[in-house]
Amino acid sequence: MSIAAQARPFASAGTRIRPRIRTTETALLALVAVTLLVGAASLGATQRLIEAGKAGESLASLDFGAPDPVALVVYLGTIGLVHVAFILAGRRIDQVLLPAVALLGGIGLLLMQRLPQDLVEQEFAGLVLGLGQLQAMWLLIAIAVIGALALGVRSDAWLRNYKYTWAAAGIGLLLLTFVFGSEVNGARLTLSIGPISGQPSELLKVILVVFLAGYLSENRSLLAEESTRLGPLRLPPIPYLAPMGVMWAIALGIVVVQRDLGAALLFFAVFLAMLYVATGRLSYVVGGLILFIAGAFVLYHLFGHVQQRVDNWLDPWADPSGAGFQVVQALYALGRGGLLGMGLGAGLPTIGGRLPVPAVHTDYPLAALGEELGLIGLLAILGLYLVVVERGLRIAAAAHDDFRSILAAGLALVMGIQAFIIAAGNLKLIPLTGITLPLISYGGSSLLANAIVVGLLLALSDRGAGAPAPPRRRRGPIARLRRARA
Amino acid sequence: MDGIVLTLWLVRLLFLALLYVFLFAVVRVLLRDLRVASRGPAELGRLVVVASPRGEPLPGAFFQLDAVTTIGRDVNNSIVVDDPFASADHAVLTFRGRAWYVEDLASTNGTFLNAIAVEGIAEVGFGDELQVGEVRLRLDRGRS
């Protein structure tokens, strides 16, 4: 036991902020910048070559300029600013998350610049912004949110102490969407309040993780107990099973009312994963899965829209130009991509002025990326999500209490599971109604919610300001004089 | 024209290659991080002194814990709590398998876990607070 030697009051550390160099992050961010610039060059050149081919001209030389250099440079500059802020703040924040997230966001930005710009258009004070510019704008806000949360959140008390308030807010948000939400493509996801419209289910997933982390860390030992016996099953005390039932009901409610299979799957999977992280008992996961399968079976037989989704998934070729159109086109796109892809900007030929894959910018970005970057590119992108999850779980393992630990694991898993679900849906492994691909898909709500996730993870990774460096002995004539006088 | 197509093809491949260079660099960082984390005997946990009206132990100080840590007023305890409400041998903290447990050693005034009296033995989660006499101690995960 080594005691008193290490005993020192906490207050002495960090009274003065000293910048702390972050070599790893600097190097990785430089690599990200180079990668994105090369990607932009490839995209710009391909687009010019295709235009020239259409016009029947032949090019003497190729201009490797980016399609929208300003947006890309501003994006990279903002990330650089956040990086500098981290250095100046002198905290020991995780150094890998920001570069990984920056690369994912950058790939998303390139994709949005490459898609037809009139896919989404919004007008601000007479200025019409296209898809790429809107995405760039949202990305800037998201990066700012990440930086602000990472540096601003010093205490987790506001998350920990108000968990039931958060839960109430979440359920309120869900009910609002149930009642006032507007239906787009057969799913009731969008909530509009005045000029602001957004998809609350994106924000809801963050709230869910915060609530579950608070609840599970408080009742961990009770949940791990086995006091109720039900035949061969041993269960924890009945009152503590209630949240499990509530979660199950919420997931089914989302399927029935919102017709959103993806979000329901995400919420329930995250719930089971966090339950496992907190209690370490596999029987909960098995029980939850059985409940889920039973619920899914009943819903399939009761509701037409679920049946239709599953039928589309089982055999999209039954109606390839109607219900199965999206799935079939996504599969064709992936097939065209092959191993190395067609190159950024070279895929996705428009059919009669329309894109082959509907909702490619929100629900099916992986189909477009698979066509243009190929299997190799897709694997790299999935690898980036794995990196984010690994960092999150490491942060969870190093956190110094249960709440922070479960919260970090939950935040990392919610992003990982969402990426996994949407990837599986795009590749026709599971039936799906759209959720977004974190950090790549177009959309303000999705980018902001994921920025909050990343920002909180960075804040949780903070191991406090480093102890101030020992005062350096001054060299030079004045110091020598002083020493001589003393 | 062919030269142009070839250059473009190389730029495309360069982009894909750079994605993997990034992944490779990240994986190297992660492996180094995991190696550092797995090296050496990690701390099992630490007790942080939250409140101590009499200043022994010092508020804000922390103790790195061994698998068995005794708490009490007697000087032979691992953590000496100089408090009139603490017994000579007050409580013992043990690390068993994956979790910490606290046991009250029949102390006069009792040991409290999150303000609830400990009867017999109780599991202590990281972030929980123990009270011995008037001294409050919080169990934190050890640093790696």
Outline where the language-model segments fall.
Chain A
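Membrane-interface capping segments at transmembrane-helix boundaries
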Residues: 9, 46-50, 219-222, 460-471
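Long extracytoplasmic/lumenal interhelical loops at the membrane interface
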Residues: 340-376
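Long, low-complexity, intrinsically disordered cytosolic termini of multi-pass membrane proteins
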Residues: 1-15, 468-486
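Cytosolic juxtamembrane amphipathic/interface segments immediately preceding
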Residues: 10-21, 58-59, 83, 125-126, ...
